[in-house]
Structure formats: structure tokens, C-alpha cells
Design a protein with these regions (language model features):
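Polybasic, glycine- and aromatic-enriched phosphate-binding surface used to engage nucleic acids
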Residues: 1-182
């Protein structure tokens, strides 16, 4: 028996086959969600004819939102593998045999840190991932980035986001330039 998730679009109900969904982590919100994943186990796009045959309900939904999908990247989607392909693929290349520390890019208002290991269906929507071979290395990195010294370093080396309160985000460059004190 097939399982389905329900998705609404323009007040119409669509069924989405659960086999085409993956778990995705949005670390900035410390939230796990489901996402349509039109790729095979090797992260290759599922061809449209195969998609429509194997996942007909999901395909109906994707066809319904096609105009919106084609507006992504200011309409410059001609280099996408297919009209339903993801524009960015950084979060698709996760090695489930490694230890991962996923952190939000913003120090405030909530700096979220999530540890992950052995989850085959793990995808990343936002944040940075530290990938380690051992749990010990992961714990060392976690300990360092949670220190007040790291937070102070980011505040000194980054520009704040404007708003009611200044929020600081950090980049890969900040991480690479951070000196660990032993």
C-alpha cells in the first residue's frame, strides 16, 4: 500500500507519494521538514517520463506549480537539468557514514547546532555542515564554536545585519580564519 502526503496549492489538494520525499533540515529554525526530491539514489535527476510514471501524483503537483518553478533565479532556469530540478545542490552531497555538525549561519537570535550521524535521507536547507570522520573530532569542533571566544571573533570579523537589533552571521571564511587556542 502506497503512502501519501497531502499538499495544497491554489486551494486544491494534491497527493504526494512518500517515496519521493526526503527529510530536510532547516537549521536556522531547528526544524525538520519533508521535501520533494526528484533525484535517484545517486543524486541524478529522475527523467520526466519516469517521474510521471513512477510518481504520477507528485508529477501532477509539479505540473501545477511549473510556472512558479520557471520563475526561479529570475527566470534563468535554462541551465537546470530539468524544469523541476533544484537550482542549488550544495545540501545534496551529504555522506551518511560521517559525523555532521550542522550550525545556523546566524549567531543570534538563535544559534542552533544539530548533530547528525548515519541518516541516509538527510538533506540540508540552510546553515553550514562540519563533516568529521570521528565523533571525537565532531565534539571538538562543537566545543570550539560554542565558546564565547568564537562568538566574539564573529562579531569582530563580520558586519551585522540591520534591523531592530544587530544580528551577526558568519561565513566559511570566518570559520577558516578562526584560530583555535590550545
Amino acid at each position: 500500500k502506497k503512502e501519501y502526503y497531502i499538499k495544497y496549492y491554489n486551494e486544491k489538494k494534491y497527493l504526494i507519494e512518500s517515496d519521493i520525499l526526503k527529510n530536510i533540515i532547516k537549521v536556522s529554525k531547528n526544524k525538520e521538514m519533508k521535501i520533494i526530491f526528484p533525484y535517484d539514489d545517486y543524486k541524478k535527476i529522475i527523467k520526466e517520463d519516469v517521474l510521471s510514471e513512477k510518481f504520477p501524483q507528485c508529477y501532477k503537483y509539479l505540473k501545477a506549480v511549473k510556472k512558479e518553478l520557471l520563475k526561479r533565479d529570475k527566470g534563468k532556469t535554462e541551465n537546470y537539468e530539468s524544469w523541476y530540478a533544484y537550482g542549488r545542490k550544495q545540501g545534496l552531497k551529504i555522506d551518511s557514514n560521517k559525523y555532521h555538525l550542522v550550525v545556523s549561519k546566524m549567531l543570534e537570535p538563535d544559534f542552533n547546532v544539530i548533530e547528525i550521524h548515519g541518516e541516509k535521507d538527510f538533506l540540508l536547507l540552510s546553515g553550514y555542515t562540519f563533516e568529521c570522520d570521528t565523533k571525537e573530532n565532531l565534539e571538538l569542533i562543537k566545543k570550539e564554536i560554542l565558546k564565547k571566544d568564537f562568538f566574539n571573533y564573529v562579531r569582530q570579523s563580520s558586519k551585522p545585519w540591520s534591523g531592530k537589533k544587530e544580528y551577526y552571521s558568519f561565513s566559511v571564511k570566518n570559520i577558516n580564519n578562526y584560530k583555535i587556542k590550545y
